[in-house]
């Protein structure tokens, strides 16, 4: 679902939508989707205006390039439970259980490694986030809730079990939402593998994603500006940047 004001610039990338629902996609007025190719498996879509470059319907979509390839963490035993953070904070990799609140204006530095999130989530209220060589793994329907006025620069590891993976989740989860609210800018490098999630980019969200592949159940753009370059081409031809499962 692409709502008014959304501007997605992925000129070197492909977007594949597996849905065969009626409609399989909705493009509302005042929107722009620029992609090397946007392939929608279903034949029924709603176009209320906007610009969609290289849009195809009833086409053959690519398979999930990462299905069954991302390992589960070696341990999901809790290391940290129900914390509150304020001010300048440096946090360590580990298993985070329950809800962890990052209060307004927190400046958060994440050390390299894997952050397993379970039985709750992280509630982020403003501030600056910096993390190189990090992976967020959701062991259940837990999430990170990015609220207003967050600025984040996050990149995936360049080696190891989670090489190139910025976000991943346990296989077979029931559907849930993952929301990026009004922010001051996200720069994300790596794969977002969230096949159970309805990912929502809300008003005035801005994101710049380098070397990215995104796999999501559904995506909703609300007045969002997102610039993407591709990461993972898989075993087939061409470059695949985003894949929607339903």
Regions found by a protein language model. Give the residues of each.
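Compositional signature of intrinsically disordered, low-complexity segments enriched in polar residues
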Residues: 1-246
């Amino acid at each position: 679902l692409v709502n008014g004001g959304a501007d997605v610039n992925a000129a070197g990338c492909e977007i594949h939508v597996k849905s065969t629902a009626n409609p399989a996609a909705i493009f509302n007025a005042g929107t722009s989707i620029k992609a090397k190719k946007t392939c929608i498996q279903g034949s029924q879509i709603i176009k209320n205006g906007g610009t969609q470059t290289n849009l195809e319907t009833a086409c053959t979509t690519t398979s999930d390039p990462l299905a069954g390839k991302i390992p589960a963490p070696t341990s999901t035993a809790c290391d940290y439970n129900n914390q509150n953070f304020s001010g300048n904070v440096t946090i360590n990799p580990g298993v985070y259980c329950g809800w962890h609140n990052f209060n307004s204006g927190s400046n958060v530095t994440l050390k390299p490694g894997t952050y397993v999130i379970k039985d709750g989530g992280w509630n982020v209220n403003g501030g600056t986030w910096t993390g190189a060589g990090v992976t967020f793994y959701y062991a259940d329907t837990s999430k990170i809730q990015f609220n207003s006025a967050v600025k984040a620069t996050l990149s995936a590891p360049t080696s190891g079990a989670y090489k190139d993976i910025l976000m991943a989740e346990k296989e077979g989860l029931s559907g849930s939402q993952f929301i990026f609210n009004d922010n001051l800018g996200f720069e994300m490098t790596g794969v977002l593998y969230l096949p159970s999630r309805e990912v929502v980019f809300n008003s005035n969200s801005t994101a710049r994603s380098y070397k990215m592949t995104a796999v999501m159940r559904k995506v909703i753009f609300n007045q969002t500006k997102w610039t993407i370059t591709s990461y993972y081409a898989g075993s087939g031809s061409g470059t695949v940047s985003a894949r929607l499962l339903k």
